Structure formats: C-alpha cells, structure tokens
C-alpha cells in the first residue's frame, strides 16, 4: 500500500511539474500591504509553487520530499517549477540558486509568508522546520519577523572602520578527515559560501581544501559573484597537478595578487585516507589594494602536521610510520615555517607579512614557550594586551592562529566558537583580524 501511495505521489508531482512549467504563480490580487499578523489557512497552500534550481537534480528530489510531507498533512500537491521557467511571485518556496537573492530564511514580510531555503543543506533543515513548526495545523497566525535562519549564513560582521584588510584562517575539513557527524563537502560548501558572504574576508588562508572541495568551491564562488557582486579568486589551488590543501582565497574586486608561490617541505601518501599525495608546505602571495596600490602586504598559509599514536605506541608524523618525538615534530614544523618566512622578510623589506594556519598546536605552546615565527607576533595575544576590540575570545585548546610582522594595527580580532552553529561546517574554529597598515 505504501509503495502504491509513493508511486501515486511521484506521478502527481511529475504531472504538476509538467503542468506548472512556464506558468506564473498566482499573484497577490489586492496588492495591499498587511500590517498585522500573517493569517495562514491550509487552502492557501494552493497558491504556492515550489521553484527549484535546475542546476542540480538533488533539488527536484528535495522538492518531492517537501511535496510529500505537505500532501501527507494537507492532501495538497504543489506545482514544481524549474527556476529557469518560473516568474518571481510572492507565493514561492525556493530551493537552491533560483536567481533570487539568497536569504536562507523563512519570514513574514509585508503581510506575506516568504520562504527561501537556499542550497541543499539549508533546504533539508528548512523543510524539516516548515513541516514540524509551521505547517503543523490547518490554520495559524505569524507576526512579522524571522522564523528560520541558517544562522551561520546570516551572522553578518562588517569590517571595522579604517581597517585595510580582513585576514582570516579557516580549516574547512577535508571529507577524508571528517567523521559521520559531518555532511560531505558538497553540502558543507553552502555553509562556507554563506560565511564568505556574511564575513567577507579579504584574504583567506584555507586548510584541508581537498579534491572534493575543489569540485564544488569554484561553483559557489561564481554564485557569490553573481548574487552579491563579491568576487573571490583562488591562488595555488594545485601544485604539480596535485591538490594543495593549504591554498589562498582573495577578493579580486578589492586587491591585486602581484605574485604567489609555495614551498613544499615533504610529500606523503596514505591509502587509508585515499590520498595518493599530500604536501606539507607554506603558500604565500603578495597583494596590493586596487584603490591604493601603495598599500602592499603578504599573506602566507600553512598546515602543521600533528602527531598520531600507532599500535606500537610510537608517536609519528600524520601519514607516516616513522617514529618522531613530539618536541622533534614541533621543532621540524617551526623550522620549516621559519625558513620560508625569513626569506619572505628579506625579499620584502618594510612590507607587513601575515601568517594564517592550522598549527595543530594549542595556544599555550606559543604563549608559554614564547615562540613565534621569526620576528612575528601572535595576533590574538597582541590584541588582548593592547585592549583591541575582541569578540568570542578563543579557548586555549584551539589550533588555528594568526601571526603578523611589520607595522600594522589590529582594529578587531574575532574567533568563531566551534561549539555552536560553526560546527556544522568543520571541527575547527575560524579566526580573523581586521588590520590597518
């Protein structure tokens, strides 16, 4: 019986899709703007259509899922229309990149119920919300306001006034390193794109941008440019036809990348993680502001190895079977990093240089030992000691840090707490600083 019902529902959905393509959704006939609560009746569902992005067949599957739940609750099947065939209307449930401004929200605005559930990740979350919290009765009233947000996508933070650049470090978690609690990169890419739109870092050092991230990241960067006018370009995404896990993103609508390069310290293979090659390296680039070419600076990005315990109890470099003492590991990583940073300082006298990275080393290592890369300062400690504006002060357990050398002023320092909404994307907290120089 259940199978028969599902077949029936699929047929109805397909028929509605076929009938709805190219048709206009019903408009608000009165044109009046209501100032009171939104009064919803189940028969009003007949006005709505589900508009899905035709870039990806997954969105039609999500439209079917939502239609199934609405039919089960109300006995109504909505028209399903491809975004390329849909005329904008107040009565839409939007799935994916439909050509409208991405909002990732369910709101009541101007007396109308507006639903836009964004990409595939937020679509799943919002569909659950709609069916459990909104479409839960034959009638209900909603006051004006916001009822659903993918909060990580909308927690906008403007850059501090008088800052030259916002520099961020972000480990976005390679699929191979993610446990079962995380979605695959093609889902999480939506959250990462939302973070870029909300926080708009100027230069971003990313770690663990693996092969799966490479498959989807450029597509989302293109969507950001189309929908928000923010242009991000990638630097050093690969090296010798191998993926560079520690690459750079930068806003090419604000800055020019004058030069870029990377230095590889070693390669390793690990079949267990399906990595044929993984490079340990420092990537860097020199930038200048488009509106002030004299403002030049460098950003370097790295990812330090972390130790693993093998069955015999020996500590090894990640991906290696060669035993190594913990202090030897730290010394090796810092010496490798110092070697390239010292060269960059010599070749760029007087130019501020900033280092982003996942150091797999908690804050006390730097604060207790007093070690920083050659002539560099730990920006979080510098911000604390100078009374700079700080939000979400980091715990001592995080591994992601920013360093700087040269003449600069910290306008703001922020740390994303990975115990809340941020954990949907990665197991690492992001960190950024607004800097003037």
Give the ranges of each region predicted by the language model.
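C-terminal motif of bacterial Sec signal peptides marking the signal peptidase cleavage site
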Residues: 16-20
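Acidic, contiguous N-terminal accessory segments
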Residues: 22-110, 114, 118-129, 133-157
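His/acidic metal-ligating clusters that form di-metal
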Residues: 281-302, 313-361, 365
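Structured beta-strand-rich core segments of catalytic domains in phosphoester-bond hydrolases
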Residues: 209-306, 414-416
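N-terminal, active-site-proximal structural segment of metallo-dependent hydrolase catalytic domains
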Residues: 156-222, 297
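Active-site environment of divalent metal-dependent phosphoester hydrolases
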Residues: 175-177, 211-215, 243, 307-310, ...
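Metal-dependent phosphoester-hydrolase catalytic domains
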Residues: 341-354, 359-437
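Acidic/histidine-rich helix-loop elements
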Residues: 169-190, 266-277, 305-329
């Amino acid at each position: 019986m259940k199978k028969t019902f599902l077949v029936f529902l699929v047929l109805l959905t397909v028929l509605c899709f076929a009938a709805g393509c190219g048709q206009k959704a019903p408009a608000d006939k009165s044109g009046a703007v209501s100032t009171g609560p939104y009064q919803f009746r189940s028969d009003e569902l007949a006005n709505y259509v589900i508009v899905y992005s035709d870039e990806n067949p997954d969105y039609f599957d999500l439209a079917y899922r939502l239609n199934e739940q609405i039919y089960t609750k109300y006995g109504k099947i909505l028209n399903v229309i491809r975004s390329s065939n849909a005329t904008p209307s107040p009565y839409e449930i939007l799935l994916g990149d439909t050509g409208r401004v991405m909002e990732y929200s369910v709101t009541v605005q101007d007396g109308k119920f507006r639903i836009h559930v964004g990409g595939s990740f937020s679509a799943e979350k919002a569909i659950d919300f709609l069916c459990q919290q909104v479409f839960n009765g034959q009638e209900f009233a909603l006051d004006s306001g916001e009822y659903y947000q993918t909060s990580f996508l909308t927690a906008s933070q403007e850059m501090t006034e008088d800052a030259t650049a916002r520099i961020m470090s972000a480990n976005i978690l390679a699929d191979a390193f993610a446990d079962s609690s995380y979605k695959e990169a093609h889902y999480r890419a939506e959250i990462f794109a939302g973070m870029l739109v909300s926080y708009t870092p100027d230069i971003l050092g990313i770690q663990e941008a693996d092969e799966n991230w490479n498959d989807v990241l450029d597509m989302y960067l293109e969507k950001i440019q189309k929908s928000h006018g923010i242009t991000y370009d990638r630097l050093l995404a690969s090296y010798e036809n191998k993926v560079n896990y520690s690459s750079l993103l930068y806003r090419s609508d604000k800055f020019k990348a004058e030069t870029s390069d990377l230095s590889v310290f070693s390669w390793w293979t690990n079949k267990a993680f399906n990595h044929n090659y993984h490079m340990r390296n420092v990537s860097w680039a020199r930038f200048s502001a488009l509106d002030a070419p004299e403002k030049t600076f460098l950003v370097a990005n790295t990812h330090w190895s972390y130790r693993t315990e093998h069955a015999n109890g020996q500590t090894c470099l990640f991906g290696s079977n060669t035993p190594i003492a913990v202090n030897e590991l730290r010394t090796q990583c810092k010496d490798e990093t110092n070697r390239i940073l010292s060269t960059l300082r010599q070749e760029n006298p007087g130019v501020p240089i900033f280092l982003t990275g996942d150091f797999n080393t908690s804050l006390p290592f730097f604060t207790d030992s007093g070690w920083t890369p050659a002539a560099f300062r730990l920006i979080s400690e510098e911000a604390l000691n100078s009374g700079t504006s700080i939000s979400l002060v980091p715990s001592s357990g995080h591994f992601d840090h920013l360093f700087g050398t040269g003449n600069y002023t910290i306008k703001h320092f922020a740390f994303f707490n990975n115990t809340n909404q941020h954990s949907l994307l990665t197991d690492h907290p992001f960190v950024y600083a607004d800097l003037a120089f």
